[in-house]
C-alpha cells in the first residue's frame, strides 16, 4: 500500500 493522493478502493 502506498500513500498517494488518488481515489482507490482498498
Swiss-Prot record:
Cellular component per GO, a single term: extracellular region
Location in the cell: Secreted; Bacterial flagellum
Superkingdom: Bacteria
Protein induction: By nickel.
Keyword tags: Bacterial flagellum, Secreted
Family assignment from sequence similarity: Belongs to the bacterial flagellin family.
Task of the protein: Flagellin is the subunit protein which polymerizes to form the filaments of bacterial flagella.
Protein name (database record): Flagellin
Amino acid at each position: 500500500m502506498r500513500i498517494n493522493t488518488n481515489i482507490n478502493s482498498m
